[in-house]
Regions:
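Soluble catalytic regions of membrane-associated enzymes that act on cell-envelope
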Residues: 202
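TPR-repeat structural position
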Residues: 42-43, 135, 185, 220-221, ...
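Flexible glycine/proline-rich, aromatic-decorated loop/lid segments
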Residues: 256-273
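Short coil/linker segments at helix-helix boundaries
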Residues: 2-58, 63-151, 158-198, 208-218, ...
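Solenoid-repeat scaffolds in large eukaryotic assemblies
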Residues: 45, 93, 156, 188, ...
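Helix-coil-helix junctions within alpha-helical repeat/solenoid scaffolds
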Residues: 301-328, 334-477
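Active-site-adjacent "gating/activation" loops or surface patches in catalytic cores
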Residues: 205
Length: 477
């Protein structure tokens, strides 16, 4: 093994897929690229595939991997690429696809099939219908590959990924527990569970990762807990994979384990951040892992853990990162600057809320400013100063109007201005409650619940629980 491979400091476990290359270094870099792609760290995945290409320019699968890593994924479909980013990305992908096709004749039959399939993943134009068409074409192409090589775990994972991306974050109807109309969730469940019966499947990060994403929205998320437990320590330095089991831990109420997994994930993320910095899209996943740690700690009543994680997150979220225009980092990340407000509200730290300063840059920190108004409004109401709470309520409504529709909430894929409408109704309920108008208060909280229920599945604050708590306080009163 060469010097470059020996110096690579990330522990990615032992997963290996043999590809057609006589160069041992190229094989090592290919394996790393594939694992990182399963871990949704697409930039590091692409970097590894480029290293593999440098070691063996004739390896078709390394070009395939580069094209795959740079394309759309479950959390970032084509329509969320900004124009500049999309143009540059498509140029790189098209070159990789050409090289993959040129070198495919020297590859195995399965590798040739994968190279052929990924050609369909590039849109013919730059409109939404073009994106939809290429996603469908790629899923159809991968279905053909799966029909020929259904016992191959990588083929199964890639096929599952292609189909799930047709209905990303919309796989199940949360009210009925049934698949959403037009989704192929039961089909994916069937072939992933068939794969889970194979030997060595618990060593495959892609299968385990996708099965968690598939089942977390279902009415039976607990069935994926075994897969989650195998994934927990499988790829120690891939923060997102270390974090993923916590999606299920939260749903089944295992907050202790959710805290532990997210704490480990944050350490892995910080290891990568210390070497490469934060000027990359993986910063979104890094913030999500911090957010999930904070979220679990809030549910567990651990204010110290939550506040320490908030401070770590804030330190790694400088204005310079938010100011990057392509991709538009503020749209993806600025909302995380507002998380401290949620923690202080959760633990009733009213004076700290009232002391929170507003950022100077009202455009860059538009979500944070709105959230601070929300938090101060709750604090004033809780302390009995309804007049000041009403002023904050008015300021909140004006602040929400300033938030562009492109700003994503931490509860991806929801938009911040939509999520804050839940906060508006909650604050209205809190104020009415403090005014002694309980019927009006509960109507506002019920409205907050309706707005919350209308959000796309994510990991949101439980408005129903807050409503129940308010009813309990009324009974006590």
């Amino acid at each position: 093994m060469g010097t470059a491979s020996k110096s690579y400091q990330y522990n990615l476990g032992t997963y290996h897929r043999k590809v057609t290359t006589a160069n041992a270094e190229a094989q090592v870099w290919f394996d790393r690229g594939l694992i990182w792609s399963y871990a949704f760290h697409h930039e590091e995945s692409a970097r590894c595939f480029e290293k593999a290409i440098a070691e063996d320019p004739g390896c078709a699968m390394s070009y395939w991997g580069l094209a795959f890593a740079l394309g759309p994924n479950y959390n970032k479909p084509w329509d969320l690429f900004d124009e500049k980013e999309l143009k540059k990305t498509l140029e790189t992908i098209e070159h990789a696809l050409t090289e993959a096709k040129d070198h495919a004749p020297d590859s195995t039959e399965l590798e040739q099939a994968l190279v052929d399939a990924v050609q369909a993943r590039v849109p013919k134009g730059l409109q939404e219908h073009d994106f939809k068409a290429c996603n469908e074409a790629y899923a159809k192409a991968m279905e053909s590959v799966y029909e020929r090589f259904s016992d191959d775990l990588d083929v199964t994972a890639l096929f599952a990924d292609s189909v799930m991306n047709l209905s990303a974050w919309d796989l199940w109807d949360l009210k009925t527990g049934k698949p959403t109309p037009g989704s192929r969730s039961l089909e994916v469940k069937g072939f992933l569970e068939k794969a889970l019966e194979q030997d060595n499947v618990y060593e495959h990060p892609g299968i385990l990762h996708l099965y968690i994403h598939l089942m977390e929205m279902s009415s039976t998320p607990e069935v994926a807990l075994v897969a989650a437990d195998h994934l927990r320590n499988l790829v120690p330095d891939a923060g997102h994979l270390v974090h993923m089991p916590s999606h299920l831990d939260i749903l089944v109420g295992d907050y202790r384990r959710a805290i532990a997994s997210n704490a480990d994930a944050c350490l892995a993320d910080e290891k990568y951040h210390n070497e490469h910095g934060g000027d990359n899209f993986y910063s979104f996943y890094r913030m999500h892992d911090y957010h999930s740690l904070i979220y679990a700690a809030m549910f567990a009543g651990q204010s110290k853990v939550a506040l320490e994680a908030v401070s770590r997150m804030e330190r790694s979220l400088p204005a310079s990162l938010l100011s990057i225009e392509s991709p538009p980092m503020a749209d993806w990340l600025e909302n995380f600057s507002s998380v401290r407000v949620h923690v202080l509200v959760r633990f009733g730290r009213w004076q700290e809320l009232l002391s929170l300063p507003f950022p100077n840059d009202k455009d860059l920190y538009c979500v944070t400013i709105a959230m601070i108004h929300y938090g101060k409004g709750v604090a004033y109401a809780a302390m009995g100063d309804v007049e000041k709470a009403l002023r904050e309520r008015a300021a909140l409504k004006e602040a929400v109007k300033r938030i562009p529709s492109s700003r994503i909430c931490g509860d991806f894929p929801n938009k911040s201005n939509v999520v804050l409408k839940v906060g508006e109704a909650m604050l209205d309920g809190e104020i009415a409650y403090r005014q002694g108008d309980y019927d009006v208060a509960f109507r506002h909280l019920e409205e907050a619940i309706k707005r919350d229920d209308a959000l796309t599945y994510a990991e949101p604050w439980p408005v129903r629980i807050l409503s129940d708590l308010s009813h309990s306080r009324d009974i006590d009163h």
